[in-house]
Swiss-Prot record:
It is a peripheral membrane protein. It comes from Rhizobium meliloti (strain 1021). It is found in: Cell inner membrane. This is Elongation factor 4. The gene is lepA. GTP binds at D23, H24, G25, K26, S27, T28, N140, K141, I142, D143. Residues 11-193 form the tr-type G domain.
Length: 608
């Protein structure tokens, strides 16, 4: 493989990303491109080279953006440098996608020739178009018997509105059509532009950062103007932090050291940065002595949207959980956590996530990579409380809700959801959206598929909306959303009381109209799960002081009159009265043990 020279002319660089829905073959295509340009030898190829986390490979999703630099000798005899940034496809990581896209000039739009366009493809394509990308359409999996390239081309033109007549037909699995993709990248995608050239003050985009056990934080950068050299003192314009660059290089996907990176190039730097949180995706990097006049637009720190409590099943694992979370945060600055304690579950953490998939992935990584057993409380969103004294505050945890008398209004976040589904499932999906307080914005048909746009409260989506959508549509519907605004809602805090004691881990915010149904389901579920005690246990769902649902677990009863044969009835009555008095005393002082399984099942209640 030829060694990368640091001075590649701009006209010979192509920066591109691959936009695709989950499972449409994005990572496999990336593998083929690496293989056919000699980026890795045959023996070093593993399936999905760029998806380095086990979870990424298993779930078939890309979570962190990864990059690779390829050298390609085109049919015109020239050698081009191709920088591929592999972007996440899932809605939770939309900000990572937008930053990755802004580091490129073009995108490959990969669509499965048997499945067609999905909701997430749409969202990412519109982001690519917003970034003024040139698009090359690639139809993958054309070796499948179910592939219908002509129908899908029409669908792309109808749904997305771009010309797909010259789409490249490939099969990433067998390698068919890969050379055509490489030629299309070189001839159809534009070269990067640099206004100042390599002598201008340094201006570079921070595309991503990750933690390496040996080198500390590694930062992936795209140089816009100027030159990024070893030994230079750089400054992050968003956080104003300064660092000295220790090493500069590119990923092929192995690390290759270089002296400098010039305009249009994508590579990595290390600079003794201790935490990933200090490097914010989307920030502008410049030279400290000779800074650029203006930072790049569009930088915003990631805000957590969904919160939930994570508690160790065994209290002895608390310190292990703390250190595991610290390690994950090194690699994922959008994940936040703080300590909280619950009367029912002991010590744990209140964690903030970008969305539900993000929550699931963090929980799964904690359990798998650090071997922890965890209980997650019901997810909640960020509510805005407008108080009667004119102040405003955010509520992340329903258990911290202040007295209702002090609250003037509660505002909850709403989302704009796009759902694509085969039309035979439309009725069920419309009903699901209506049950979740959705407001229909539009409904359009594309061939045999319906495209729905709905406004929905995020509170109704975080529970189990996605699972319900998949089960109604037998897995065919796809779903994508953006958070739009906070609106006033008729929301109440529902508490669950067991034997008159509130259980903090089970309290949740619900809409007043749905409270009774939700409360009844919860009480019934707990009645099945809590074992019988020697005394009667009432389980109640309450809003403030009003009980809205109740179930009672009957007492285990010992037959105290068994030893009385015949004889006086008053003798039996005396024993029964004594038993009754004992049970009354027990109920007053007795503690109800709620097993861990009951918590886990009650919190999963909405998945059914």
């Amino acid at each position: 493989m030829n060694t990368p020279s640091s001075k590649t002319p701009l006209s010979h660089i192509r920066n591109f990303s691959i936009v695709a829905h989950i499972d449409h073959g994005k990572s496999t295509l990336a593998d083929r491109l690496i293989q056919s340009t000699g980026g890795l030898a045959e023996r070093e190829m593993s399936e999905q080279v760029l998806d380095s986390m086990d979870i990424e490979r298993e779930r078939g999703i890309t979570i962190k953006a990864q990059t690779v630099r390829l050298h390609y000798k085109a049919n015109d005899g020239e050698t081009y440098v191709l920088n591929l940034i592999d972007t996440p496809g899932h809605v939770d990581f939309a900000y990572e996608v937008s930053r990755s896209l802004s580091a490129c000039e073009g995108s490959l739009l990969v669509v499965d020739a048997s499945q067609g366009v999905e909701a997430q493809t749409l969202a990412n394509v519109y982001q690519a178009i917003d970034n003024n990308h040139e698009l090359v359409t690639v139809l993958n999996k054309i070796d499948l018997p179910a592939a219908e390239p002509e129908r899908i081309k029409e669908q792309i033109e109808e749904v997305i509105g771009i010309d797909a007549s010259d789409a490249v037909l490939i099969s990433a699995k067998t390698g068919l059509g890969i050379p055509d993709v490489l030629e299309a990248i070189v001839h159809k995608l534009p070269a990067p532009k640099s206004e100042g050239g390599d002598t201008a003050p340094l201006k570079a985009l921070l595309v991503d950062s990750w933690y390496d056990a040996y080198l500390g934080v590694m930062v992936l950068v795209r140089v816009i103007d100027g030159t990024l050299k070893k030994g230079m003192t750089i400054r992050m314009m968003g956080t104003d932090a300064k660092y000295q660059v220790e090493r500069v290089g590119v990923l092929t996907p192995k690390m290759v050291a270089m002296e400098a990176l010039g305009p249009g190039e994508i590579g990595f730097i290390t600079a003794s940065i201790k935490e990933v949180a200090d490097t914010r995706v989307g920030d502008t990097i410049t030279e400290d002595k000779r800074p650029t006049a203006k930072a790049l637009p569009g930088f915003k720190p990631a805000q957590p949207v969904v919160f939930c409590g994570l508690f160790p099943v065994d209290a002895a694992d608390f310190e292990d959980l703390r250190s595991a979370m610290g390690k994950l945060r090194l690699n994922d600055a959008s994940f936040s956590f703080e300590m909280e304690s619950s009367a029912a579950l002991g010590f744990g953490f209140r964690c903030g996530f970008l969305g539900l998939l993000h929550l699931e992935i963090i929980q799964e990584r904690l359990e798998r990579e650090f071997d922890l057993d965890l209980i997650a409380t019901a997810p909640s969103v960020v509510y805005k409380l407008f108080m009667t004294d004119g102040s405003e505050r955010e509520l992340h945890n329903p258990a911290d809700m202040p007295d209702v008398v002090k609250i003037a209004e509660i505002h909850e976040p709403w989302i704009r959801a796009t759902i694509l589904t085969p039309d035979e499932y439309l009725g069920g999906i419309l009903k699901l959206c209506q049950d979740r307080r959705g407001i229909q914005i539009e409904l359009t048909y594309v061939g045999t598929r319906a495209m729905l746009t709905y406004d929905l409260p995020l509170n109704e989506v975080v529970f189990d909306f996605y699972d319900r959508l998949k089960s109604i549509s037998k897995g065919y519907a796809s779903f994508d959303y953006q958070i739009t605004e906070h609106k006033e809602g008729n929301l109440v805090k529902m508490s669950i009381l067991v034997n008159g004691e509130p259980v903090d881990a089970l309290s949740m915010m619900v809409h007043r109209m749905a409270a009774e149904k939700r409360g009844r389901e919860m009480c019934e579920k707990l009645k099945e799960l809590i074992p019988k005690h020697m005394f009667k246990i009432p389980i109640q769902a309450a809003i403030g002081g009003n009980v809205i649902a109740r179930e009672t677990i009957s007492a285990l009863r010992k037959d105290v009159t068994a030893k009385c044969y015949g004889g006086d009835a008053t003798r039996k009555r005396k024993l029964l009265e004594k038993q009754k008095a004992g049970k009354k005393r027990m109920r007053q002082f007795g503690k109800v043990e709620i097993p861990q399984e009951a918590f886990i099942a009650a919190l999963k209640m909405s998945d059914e």
